[in-house]
């Protein structure tokens, strides 16, 4: 089987929430849990969920960047989604920059870089 990378629009099977992601797929998946797909892509089942619902799998990546999907998925576990993805990334990067500024000799690094 050949590896493929595809941008994808999918619908989460349990919540009906649509989301965007990308698919990295090679080979074939099989087994009884495939009867319970994680999502649907263009009408075809994608991924799987265990009978107890505690294990879910998907070839789709990047789905949790979608704020609406993440909120719906977490809501299925009774957990609220806090904040948007992009804002969270910015906050994390700002905190990392502050940490580096405190613990690194930034001026010295800039001198070395010139």
Segments and roles (model prediction):
Residues 1-49:
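Pocket-forming structural segment of enzyme catalytic cores
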Residues 46-114:
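Acyltransferase
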């Amino acid at each position: 089987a050949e590896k493929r990378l595809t941008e994808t629009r999918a619908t989460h099977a349990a919540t009906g929430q649509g989301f965007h992601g990308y698919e990295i797929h090679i080979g074939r998946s099989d087994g009884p849990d495939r009867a319970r797909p994680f999502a649907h892509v263009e009408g075809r089942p994608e991924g799987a969920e265990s009978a107890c619902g505690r294990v879910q799998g998907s070839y789709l990546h990047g789905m949790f960047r979608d704020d609406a999907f993440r909120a719906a998925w977490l809501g299925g576990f009774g957990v609220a989604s806090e904040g948007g993805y992009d804002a969270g990334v910015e906050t994390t990067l700002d905190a990392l920059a502050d940490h580096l500024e405190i613990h690194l000799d930034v001026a010295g690094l800039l001198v070395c870089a010139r």
